[in-house]
A protein has these predicted regions:
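Conserved GNAT-fold acetyl-CoA-binding loop/helix
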Residues: 30-48
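Conserved acetyl-CoA-binding loop-helix of GNAT-fold acetyltransferases
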Residues: 96-112, 137
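Conserved N-terminal entry element of GNAT/NAT acetyltransferase domains
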Residues: 1-19, 174-179
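Conserved acetyl-CoA binding element of GNAT-fold acetyltransferases
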Residues: 76, 80-93, 127
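Conserved catalytic-core motifs of GNAT/GCN5-like acyltransferases
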Residues: 127, 145-162
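Conserved beta-strand-loop-alpha-helix junction that forms the acyl-donor binding cleft
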Residues: 120-140, 153-154
Length: 179
């Protein structure tokens, strides 16, 4: 059952949606979440942000919770029926209960996207710095499962070297969604 408090607005490559993405970039900077979202240092400007998010194969969404802009997510590195998910919740929505409800609702919604061949995704993957326990533990609280640690799995631009990454995965089964 879908949570009616969640609305996910797909962000395509139109002028209006580019302006929404510019506003999101500005908010990430003002809320100081840009560097922890792009810990690898690849995004240093608005244009780099737009190029990354609007890259072919990326599925970006503006997240609304109870009618208010609550965050932003995108899915990329789509292979078969798997994709990597990335999430940013705006500060107004930080807090254990709200954030967990939103995260679980997003996982449920994306894992029930369908086309003529059935479900688009069977698994969503997430990889974060192991030291960012807040991020990967949130995914676990939202229904993901811990797969394990990948040695030197991410590049940490702040330290200028590779660091261990935590890999998590969420499926319809881990969320208890009947098929």
């Amino acid at each position: 059952m879908q949570d009616s408090r969640l609305h996910m607005h797909y962000l395509g490559d139109t002028n209006a949606e580019r302006n929404l993405l510019r506003a999101i970039y500005g908010r990430l900077k003002s809320e100081k979440t840009l560097s922890c979202t792009y810990y690898d240092g690849t995004i240093r400007s608005e244009e780099e942000f737009l190029a990354d998010i609007l890259h072919p194969g990326s599925l970006p969404f503006l997240i609304f919770w109870e009618g208010r802009q609550a965050g932003f997510c995108w899915f990329n590195t789509v292979r078969g029926k798997s994709a990597y998910g990335h999430f940013v919740f705006f500060r107004d929505f930080w807090g254990h209960q709200t954030t967990c409800r939103m995260g679980r609702a997003i996982f449920s919604r994306v894992l029930t996207f369908k086309d003529q061949q059935g479900y688009l995704f069977d698994v969503l993957l997430g990889m974060t710095p192991r030291k960012n326990a807040l991020a990967w533990r949130l995914a676990l609280l939202c229904g993901a499962r811990q797969i394990g640690v990948i040695p030197h799995g991410i590049f940490d631009a702040a330290n200028g070297k590779s660091a261990d990454a935590m890999l998590v995965a969420v499926t319809r089964e881990s969320l208890g969604i009947e098929q």
